Amino acid sequence: MIGRLHGTVVEKSAPQIIIDIHGVGYEVETPLPTFCQVALGKEATLWIHQVIREDANLLYGFIDREERALFRLLLKVSGV
């Protein structure tokens, strides 16, 4: 599992960003507050929640651990 990514933000298109880490670009879905806090061309650290499915490998990125923890709590709620 990927827990954290640190690299340069090379592309932003709400709600996704692409963060480059040693030549590999990771596409990360972000909530609006996180999207607004990362700057194009600057380094960023994102705390990751990874979802692996048969047809997809999704990365959800958050500016801090607390946002990620809240997201994980919401996933446990029935119907969400």
Residue ranges: model-predicted function:
Residues I2, H6, V10-V80:
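Long, highly charged, low-complexity intrinsically disordered interaction regions
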